[in-house]
Amino acid sequence: MKLQKLRNIGIIAHVDAGKTTLTERLLHFTGALHSMGEVHHGGTVTDHMVQERQRGITIASAAVTVGWRDHRINIIDTPGHIDFNIEVNRSLRVLDGAVVVFDSVAGVEPQSETNWRLADQYGVPRICLVNKMDRIGADYLRVVAMIRERLGAQPLVVHLPVFVEETYVGLIDLTTMSLHRWNADDGWKYSSEEITPEYQEQAAQYRAQLEETLVELDDELLEGWFNGATLQADDLKRLIRQGVVSGAFVPVLCASAFKNKGVQMVLDAVVDYLPSPQEVKGMETVDGAQIVDADVDGAFAALAFKVVNDKHGALTYVRVYRGTLQSGSRVLNTNVGQYERIGRIYEMHADRKVARDRIGAGDIVALVGMKHTQTGDTLCAPEAPLVLERINAPEPVMDIVIEPKSRQDQDRLGEALRAIVGEDPSLRLSTGAAGETLVSGMGELHLEIVVDRLQTDFDIAVTVGRPQVAYRETITQSAAVDYVYKKQKGGPGQFAEVRMRFEPIAGDGIEFESQIVGAAIPREYIPAVEDGVRQAARSGVLGGYPCGGFKAVLLDGAYHAQDSSQLAFSVAGREAFKEAMAQATPRLLEPVMAVEIVTPRDHVGDCIGDLMRRRGSILNQLDRGDACVINAEAPLAEMFGYIGDLRTMTAGRASFSMTFSHYAETPQGVADAVLNAD
């Protein structure tokens, strides 16, 4: 198939906006699925994990392929829960377009904003879908306004919903100025008719706005439009596509996926408005020396964006950016400098595999036989090595202790955890001070799924400690240190001297700078100093928590021609950091969460009072229909078990969502309690 007829898209949204239901309908309406499943019945294709079907949520991104109007569409359905945001991150990294789904009542929600920023970061063209138009209180134009105000985007109204009394029955397509009305009993069937009188004025108003926006993209059409020329539907669709690809605006559609209304128009929009691999900007290499454009005739280049372990071994999901690949070929993993032999190639349909002998630029497939490849690694032709930008995983904010109930399972537990962590870059595996196994993740649900998988997928009974906050440490003042490492016990010794300055910086990262002039320290030893600092920063001086938010500057030093080594300078850097941190007024940092609560108005006071008792701060209050939306920030340490307390306060009528915001200094009294407890 020609690249022009290929679409690689993702379905992204806040949890419960209807992503998976929409994906199920897309599969059904394209003929890829004969019998539709439902999320609430645990029978959908893309939610195939046991944990997904039990909980009715998407946990892992799933890839499926469908055909529509002679086009092939690779679809990745992503999770909406913040704990699994790494799945959205790595999916957007390899996609050419996205359908962003919004609930017609809730509108733009916290995870909608997080996903939107990720799509901005990767420059992914988007179309928006206001879903669940059958809900009581559905307000399409209010959601359009929220897209403009909360996301800073330029929404382009392409559809208008049509209601009979309060029942959603169809939509007006402003490009063709026709009304599509669905059969009440069969979403496959709809009629296209003239716009009814009660909608003609509104349709004319929004059609004029649509034309006014689009003609700005074409000088010739603009001149004709000013002279009264009528714009044709094909011209409008071409200009919408042009604006979507350039990021000038986002078309907004409407539908009710669950009621099977509007699904065909979503598929049409994917084909008409979202770009092919050839229409998006090529992928830049890490060194900036190359732009990898979609070209089947070039040297092979691909990015591994996901690794999944199933009963048959590891599946490595890749996006091919350039060239072609056949099963049995040998490729180079440039991140680790290892060659890989491709065993089999599969086109994935959720958990079902279709074998392929050959793939090319634009394809998203799974490879079997990878032994050294992890998420974010580049695979390429050995004769044309390059490195693509890796996928950055967020830092975990919560830890749990996991131990096997039987000592005989200790080794199996380690192997299982390494397999799970290998699949999910937002998980971390470490050993605590007492030798216990620590698993760090993005939230309570994230870690619950890990425990559930250990017991269900690996048949290992475990005991689990209470979730703990992933604290950090930082410095608040500058400190200078002159450290000499000298070791002499007969034979070759060890010697290294470093003079360093450590200073606080914004954020929680670590920066290193060498100001060495001349040959005070040979160039080959300077990376060892940085490595020593970074190793030491894994365990701060207050409570052994990771340390960040500082810059290390190597000012001067000395070496010995016979006794100096990389090891000696690494030790010197490590010990210099420890001394400096003790002098630089270290402080404990805690993760602060962005919290959104949707509550009936008569419970607003209770919710705000409870948040204040949890050391929270209220950012704003907004009206949403008959409810009130409270936006706040609160320390994660105070939010464990919050959902139960909220249900009690509001008789089960309120809901909330929580996303990581930033790290902030822990109040001294709280910090003392945390450190003394440790």
From Swiss-Prot:
Location of the protein in the cell: Cytoplasm
Reported function: Catalyzes the GTP-dependent ribosomal translocation step during translation elongation. During this step, the ribosome changes from the pre-translocational (PRE) to the post-translocational (POST) state as the newly formed A-site-bound peptidyl-tRNA and P-site-bound deacylated tRNA move to the P and E sites, respectively. Catalyzes the coordinated movement of the two tRNA molecules, the mRNA and conformational changes in the ribosome.
Record domain tr-type G: where: 4-278
Chief place of localization: cytoplasm
Binding residues for GTP: 13-20, 77-81, 131-134
UniProt-recorded name of the protein: Elongation factor G 2
GO-annotated cellular components: cytoplasm
Pfam family, one: EFG_C
InterPro entries cross-referenced by the UniProt entry: EFG_II, EFG_III, EFG_III/V, EFG_IV, EFG_V, EFG_V-like, EFTu-like_2, P-loop_NTPase
Family (UniProt): Belongs to the TRAFAC class translation factor GTPase superfamily. Classic translation factor GTPase family. EF-G/EF-2 subfamily.
GO biological process, one term: ribosome disassembly
Keywords assigned by UniProt, alphabetized: Cytoplasm, Elongation factor, GTP-binding, Nucleotide-binding, Protein biosynthesis
GO molecular function, one term: GTP binding
Superkingdom per UniProt: Bacteria
Gene: fusA2
HAMAP family linked to this entry: EF_G_EF_2_B
